[in-house]
């Protein structure tokens, strides 16, 4: 019988929070606040033999920064990865409130970092269709530059128009 705790693993989708976000939201509680610190997750990694993990942004700068800025989100992701080099990696964030040129410039700077594996797009959190023109240009840039794009989708059939439905994703 295989002991699951001893098998080496990669956790491909985790959410952690920077200390200032945790501190500012302590009274609200919730799993991201109560267990979202890097130290908490490193203990889990050690306990369950997780060799590396990929920190995912939310595409919502209000979740990973106190100044609600995607550049601060990236710095927070880098700081978290730096607490466990070669164990914690991350995906770049995107904030569609920025114009497309600014977004591409930010991404070009960020993907040069060794801890960045690619870009995460969470269309539901941005409330913008995954097959919309803004993302279309981001996908063109990513394809041209051989950048991995992770699309977060949880289809919801009760919606008339789901921005991250498989039908929309296949259009990308």
PLM region spans:
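An N-terminally biased module of ancient metal coordination in phosphate/nucleic-acid-related enzymes
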Residues: 1-68, 72
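Short secondary-structure boundary/capping segments
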Residues: 1-2, 6, 80-81, 172
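Alpha-helical scaffolding within the catalytic cores
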Residues: 35-44, 71-78, 104-106, 166-170
């Amino acid at each position: 019988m295989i002991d699951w705790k001893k098998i080496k693993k990669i956790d491909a989708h985790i959410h952690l929070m920077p200390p200032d976000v945790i501190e500012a939201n302590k009274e609200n509680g919730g799993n991201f606040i109560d267990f979202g610190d890097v130290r908490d997750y490193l203990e889990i990694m050690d306990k369950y033999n997780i060799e590396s993990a990929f920190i995912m942004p939310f595409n919502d700068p209000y979740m990973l920064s106190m100044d609600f800025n995607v550049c601060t989100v990236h710095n927070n992701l880098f700081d978290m990865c730096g607490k466990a080099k070669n164990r914690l990696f991350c995906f770049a964030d995107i904030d569609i409130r920025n114009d497309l040129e600014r977004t591409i410039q930010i991404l070009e700077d960020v993907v040069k970092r060794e801890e960045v594996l690619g870009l995460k797009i969470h269309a539901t959190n941005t409330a913008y269709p995954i097959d919309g023109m803004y993302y279309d240009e981001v996908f063109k840039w990513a394809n041209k530059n051989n950048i991995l794009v992770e699309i977060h989708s949880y289809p919801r059939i009760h919606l008339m128009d789901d921005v991250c439905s498989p039908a929309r994703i296949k259009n990308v």
